Every structure is written in C-alpha cells, then in structure tokens.
Amino acid sequence: MTSKLEQLKQYTTVVADTGDFDAIARLKPVDATTNPSLLLKAAALPRYAEHLRQATAGSGGDAGLACDRFAVAVGKDILGVIPGRISTEVDARLSFDSEATLARAHRLIELYDEQGIDRERVLIKIASTWEGIRAAEILEREGIQTNLTLLFSFAQAVACADAGVFLISPFVGRIYDWYKKSENRDYVGAEDPGVQSVSRIYRYYKANGYKTVVMGASFRNLGQIEQLAGCDRLTISPDLLQQLADAQGELPRLLLPGEGEPRQVLDESTFRWQMNEDAMATEKLAEGIRLFARDQEKLEYQLATRH
C-alpha cells in the first residue's frame, strides 16, 4: 500500500512549511513556504552561512535589506529543488501600513528578479489585516501574486476572496490551540475548530466560484491533515511530512465542495467589527504578528552583528 503522503498528493497539492533545503529535497513537495521564524532557524544551519555573509555584505548596513536578501537567497535555493512556488514574507512590522507593504513586496520581487527568478514562481506573504489585504489587491493587479497568511477568521477569508488574492493560508493548529486552552478540552477529527474553520472557508469559496487557492497551514497532528485531505493545498512541517511518508493505511478524501454560504462583501467597518467580535481571531492575529516581528528583529540583529 502507498504511504499516506502519496495518497494525500492524489487529492491535494503538498507544500513544505520550512526553510530547510535538505528536508525539502528529501520530501519532494510541489511548493514551499517560509516566514521570519523559519528563516531564523535556517540562519543557524551551516549550509546557509555563505548566504548570510553575502546578504550582509551587499546591504550597506541596512539590516532590513540584509534580511530580504537572505530570504531571497534561501528562496532561490529552494526553487532549485521544487517545481512550484516559494512564499516569501513581508516584514510583519508593516502589517498595518499598505504603502510600506507594497514597497517591501516590490523590493522582494526586484531581488528575485536580480537572481533570475521569474515572479511567477514567487508568492509574497502578507498578514491578513485590512491594510495587508488592500496591499495584496493592488499587487495582484500588478501581476504579483500573494499569499495572505495569519488567517484565523471567516471575515478575513471573505475579504481576501473579494480582493482577488491568489492564495490564503488559514491556520488550523493555532485555532485548535486557542480553543483547547480556552475550553480546557481536546478536539479530534471533524470537531476540531481549526478543521471546521478551513472546511467552512473552502466550501464558501467553491460554492461562490472564487479562484483564490485555500492552503491549510499550521498543523499539530496527522488527524488535522487527514480531515482536510482534498483541500487545494496544505503546507506541512517536515516532521509531519515524514510521519505521513511513514504511515500506512487508507487516507480517503474527506474535504469536498458542498453547500456554502451566500457570497458576501465586507466594507472596512464591517470587517473590523467582525474581527472584534471574534476573540480567537483577534488574539491569534495580534500574537502571530508579534511573533513574526520578534523573529524578524532577531534575524536583523544577527545579520547586523556579523563579523
């Protein structure tokens, strides 16, 4: 019998959620995603020492530029061993500034262009704030495709679809974490709030004909992945990918298009109110931005203090 990973690939495009080149080469995903936290981990790997040196040397003392150059160097390496796209993230500290997000996205695309990488192979990752979604809407019109991340609520998903973004990354595990702590109980299978969130978004998109790709992210266990077999894409850590590769048994497609809610359009005030009313999404979005910003600052410090 084929492994659960091979069975999953029959229904869903599998993406590696890592900056670890060796893991990607071994597990052979279609796409890969990175973020400041993953890049900080990658910076500790010996194989990236030269990339760190070159990123610093070519940045004129600008630590933010050095981080972007390092992210692009890692992305270029990864693109050498996958057939699809790399997602590279805009500095999370710009999450509430549309103009600054646009400028940083343009810089990342220019850096990839300097490395001979076509923009068709790059997704610009942006936090799913109102300002981030507006920036993504403009980038999509310019032919720069985007991945809207830190997505925890239906309101965020509705706004992203209306903006015509290429792909969203609704988080499963972090939603699960919040409800597990808040309700002081565990969740398994289809009752998992993170699984339910992605399933609802997926069915809404399919029922209303949206082309935006749904890529489930942030998994805590194989059960969550198995429940979402059939989602457009799933981005999975190397550890869980390896567990899937080692696992035998049937893995049926459990997520199918079905009856979805009617099409909605949210203006800014309605979006903000719906986010305000969703304590989990409000807390997890803010926390996610803080964590990515912290790791961005750590990576900048590491690059700025290299000798």
Swiss-Prot record:
The keyword Transferase applies. One of its GO terms (biological process) is pentose-phosphate shunt. Its EC number is 2.2.1.2. Keywords: Cytoplasm, Pentose shunt, Schiff base, Transferase. It is an enzyme of class 2 (transferase). One of its GO terms (cellular component) is cytosol. GO terms for molecular function: transaldolase activity. The active site is at residue 125. It is found in: Cytoplasm. PROSITE patterns: TRANSALDOLASE_1, TRANSALDOLASE_2. It comes from the Bacteria. The keyword Cytoplasm applies. SUPFAM superfamilies: Aldolase (SSF51569). Gene3D superfamilies: Aldolase class I (3.20.20.70). It catalyses: D-sedoheptulose 7-phosphate + D-glyceraldehyde 3-phosphate = D-erythrose 4-phosphate + beta-D-fructose 6-phosphate. Pathway: Carbohydrate degradation; pentose phosphate pathway; D-glyceraldehyde 3-phosphate and beta-D-fructose 6-phosphate from D-ribose 5-phosphate and D-xylulose 5-phosphate (non-oxidative stage): step 2/3. Belongs to the transaldolase family. Type 1 subfamily. PANTHER family: TRANSALDOLASE. Homodimer. Transaldolase is important for the balance of metabolites in the pentose-phosphate pathway. HAMAP family: Transaldolase_1. This is Transaldolase.
